[in-house]
């Protein structure tokens, strides 16, 4: 049963984006010489989105069958290419708090017809950062650093809030440092947005 579900899920997720979504939530464009990277988060309904890599004649999407609460772009891993950070609401068996951070990249590939196209592929489908994720934002690399950071607003089990920075560690996000901890949500939100 699990193997069948995994195979069906993998096949379904790899299908090229075939339909038009009802609305485009947000998009970001980056010009890199002759390569143009564009990303769109397209909403079909409250719990079905498509993360679409455009920038060419052919496009390919990644199906997100979860409500989305946040969408950001930036160079997470320092490779010079834009990545996509998507906040989804998805509970897991061992971690029922619903908000997650998924990170995607854009690659060149071919579709079933052998045509060159832009594809969306996951870099990290995280179940947890540190605390209970409430929100996040991408911070561009600091001077002298090649990697950006993800600043996360997290709640704690004692109803307080923490704002922390995370950096890419080769596979996934690694805690870097706290900005502030043990504060109310309003104070933490101010630090998240600094």
Where are these regions (language model features)?
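Sec-dependent N-terminal signal peptides
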Residues: 4-15
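Beta-propeller-forming repeat regions
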Residues: 19-194
């Amino acid at each position: 049963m699990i193997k069948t579900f995994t195979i069906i899920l993998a096949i379904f997720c790899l299908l090229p984006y075939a339909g038009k979504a009802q609305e485009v939530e947000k998009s970001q464009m980056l010009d890199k010489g002759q390569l143009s990277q564009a990303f769109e988060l397209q909403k079909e309904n409250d719990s079905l989105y498509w993360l679409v890599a455009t920038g060419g004649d052919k496009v390919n999407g990644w199906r997100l069958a979860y409500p989305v609460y946040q969408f950001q772009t930036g160079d997470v891993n320092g490779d010079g290419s834009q990545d996509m950070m998507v906040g989804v609401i998805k509970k897991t068996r061992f971690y029922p708090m619903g908000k997650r951070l998924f990170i995607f990249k854009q690659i060149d590939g071919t579709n079933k017809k052998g045509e060159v196209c832009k594809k969306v592929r996951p870099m990290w489908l995280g179940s947890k950062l540190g605390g209970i994720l409430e929100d996040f934002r991408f911070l561009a690399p600091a001077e002298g650093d090649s990697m950006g950071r993800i600043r996360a607003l997290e709640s704690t089990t004692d109803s307080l809030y923490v704002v922390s920075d995370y950096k890419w560690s080769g596979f996934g996000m690694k805690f870097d440092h706290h900005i502030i901890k043990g504060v109310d949500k309003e104070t933490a939100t101010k630090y998240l947005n600094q």
